[in-house]
């Protein structure tokens, strides 16, 4: 917990006359502490938007995943049902969610075809660069994970990517359209056609990899799960397209991070050893549980949960401040909640802001290793690995080997923006 940041938040509150019920934001006012996407941000649509060809990327449901996972065992449906029961999972429950998702995907496809739009339906394995080039727009039919997958192969900043939550009861869908359009997708298409929406240009992180023994070939973590291989073995398997080199200059990796990049040892119980340089500053040796670099989009995902503080911790800090004689106001639940919420909301920023928020997870601080900044905004971050079995994971789905001698450079470039839409509820 960053206690100095909490104290700064507390000072800001004291300096205001803030002990009144918060007023409701006006219609045209940005909500305090929230990214602009939550308050109707983005840029107005220049006329309507009506694609001719759309690719729909459908998520793999848990039911489909379990089927694929044991496909080599040639299990019958009854065998699968019994196996899931042994693991404490409900076969009927998984099948029900699968049917709900499938029905909503069919609704999306039928709605598109009713408008005369050519449609391709693909799953993860069929989704490739050729499919993206064919389409005028990409629709992610699933949840946030499917949206991240769909965005990962779209490098053209002018090609829209739209998320539709196909199971709102079980999926949050922060990156998707409001849930009402799950069952009313024709209405969404009409609003697109009339220009009744706003573009949101989400910034993404581009990655360069250089150094000794690097391998720029990615590993699909979803496919790895299906292969039942442990992550520590992922980079030891023999691959035809292995492009490992003894030493090389910077190579631009074929993915962009919409949410975040995580760097750390594959075995979470092992400390990650690396050197870090922020905005071309001096290199600093660190040991920690890894580091997270996020965009404004990802600031309310993993990064938020790494950095957020609990009300209990805030109350403890305020009690210490009161004992030191620095707190004159009465300590009550309202004060604790106000400080907690303001601090946590300060961790969020607009998806359109061209900056990276990096966070060090559980830094080790002693006479050898330091952590001068546990969390900081930056425009460029470079990391040199001193790890043994580490990985660099993009949006939780694509992994790159990142061991001793490898150097990763991460930055924001306007060319990498992702074009998404905002529709009102």
UniProtKB/Swiss-Prot annotation:
Which Gene3D superfamilies would you find in this protein's record?
Answer: Probable inorganic polyphosphate/atp-NAD kinase, domain 1, Probable inorganic polyphosphate/atp-NAD kinase, domain 2
What is its subcellular localisation?
Mitochondrion
Question: What cellular-component terms does GO give this entry?
Answer: mitochondrion
Activity control note: Inhibited by NADH, NADPH and NADP(+).
Identify residues that carry Phosphoserine: 171, 350
Its EC number(s): 2.7.1.23
Q: PTM N6-acetyllysine: at which residues?
A: 59, 300, 380
Q: What InterPro entries does UniProt report for this protein, alphabetically?
A: ATP-NAD_kinase_N (IPR017438), ATP-NAD_kinase_PpnK-typ_C (IPR017437), NAD/diacylglycerol_kinase_sf (IPR016064), NADK (IPR002504), NADK2_mit (IPR012355)
Q: Where is the transit peptide?
A: 1-45
What SUPFAM superfamilies does the record tag this protein with?
Answer: NAD kinase/diacylglycerol kinase-like (SSF111331)
Map out region (Disordered) in residue numbers: 20-46
Predominant place of localization: mitochondrion
Source organism's superkingdom? Eukaryota
N6-succinyllysine PTM sites in chain numbering? 59, 285, 300
**Protein keywords:** Acetylation, ATP-binding, Kinase, Mitochondrion, NAD, NADP, Nucleotide-binding, Phosphoprotein, Transferase, Transit peptide
Q: Does the keyword NADP apply?
A: yes
Give the reactions, separated by semicolons, that this protein catalyses.
NAD(+) + ATP = ADP + NADP(+) + H(+)
GO biological process entries? NAD metabolic process; NADP biosynthetic process
Q: Name one GO molecular function term.
A: ATP binding
Could you give the subunit structure recorded for this chain? Answer: Homodimer.
Similarity-based family: Belongs to the NAD kinase family.
- Briefly state the protein's biological role: Mitochondrial NAD(+) kinase that phosphorylates NAD(+) to yield NADP(+). Can use both ATP or inorganic polyphosphate as the phosphoryl donor.
The molecule here is called: NAD kinase 2, mitochondrial
């Amino acid at each position: 917990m960053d206690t100095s940041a909490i104290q700064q938040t507390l000072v800001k509150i004291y300096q205001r006359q803030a002990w009144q019920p918060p007023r409701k934001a006006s219609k045209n006012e940005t909500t305090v502490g929230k990214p602009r996407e939550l308050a109707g941000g983005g840029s107005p649509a220049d006329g309507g938007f009506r694609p001719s060809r759309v690719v729909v990327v459908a998520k793999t449901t848990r039911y489909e995943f379990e089927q694929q996972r044991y496909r080599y065992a040639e299990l019958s449906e009854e065998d699968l049902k019994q196996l899931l029961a042994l693991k404490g999972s409900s076969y009927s429950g998984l099948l029900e969610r699968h049917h709900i998702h499938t029905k909503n995907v069919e609704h999306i496809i039928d709605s598109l075809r009713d408008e005369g739009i050519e449609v391709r339906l693909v799953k993860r394995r069929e989704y490739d660069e050729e499919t993206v080039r064919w389409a005028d727009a990409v629709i992610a039919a699933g949840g946030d994970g499917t949206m991240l997958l769909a965005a990962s192969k779209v490098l053209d900043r002018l090609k829209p990517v739209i998320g539709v939550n196909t199971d709102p009861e079980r999926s949050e869908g922060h990156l998707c359209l409001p849930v009402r359009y799950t069952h009313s997708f024709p209405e969404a298409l009409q609003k697109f056609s009339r220009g009744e929406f706003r573009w949101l240009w989400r910034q993404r992180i581009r990655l360069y990899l250089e150094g000794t023994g690097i391998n720029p070939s990615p590993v699909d973590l979803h496919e790895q799960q299906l292969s039942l291989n442990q992550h520590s073995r992922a980079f030891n398997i023999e691959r035809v397209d292995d492009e490992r080199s003894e030493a090389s200059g910077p190579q631009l990796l074929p993915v962009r991070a919409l949410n975040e990049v995580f760097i750390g040892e594959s075995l979470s119980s092992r400390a990650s050893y690396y050197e870090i340089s922020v905005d071309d500053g001096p290199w600093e040796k660190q040991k920690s549980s890894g580091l997270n670099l996020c965009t404004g989009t990802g600031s309310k995902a993993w990064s938020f949960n790494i950095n957020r503080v609990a009300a209990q911790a805030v109350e403890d800090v305020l009690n210490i401040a009161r004992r030191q004689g620095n707190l004159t106001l009465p300590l009550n639940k309202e004060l604790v909640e106000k400080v907690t919420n303001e601090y946590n909301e300060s961790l969020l920023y607009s998806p359109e802001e061209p900056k990276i928020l990096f966070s060090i997870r559980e830094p080790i601080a002693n006479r050898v290793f330091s952590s001068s900044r546990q969390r900081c905004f930056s425009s460029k971050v470079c990391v040199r690995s001193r790890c043994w079995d580490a990985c660099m994971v993009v949006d939780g789905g694509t992994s790159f080997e990142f061991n001793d001698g490898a150097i990763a450079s991460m930055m924001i470039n306007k060319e990498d923006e992702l074009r998404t839409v905002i529709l009102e509820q």
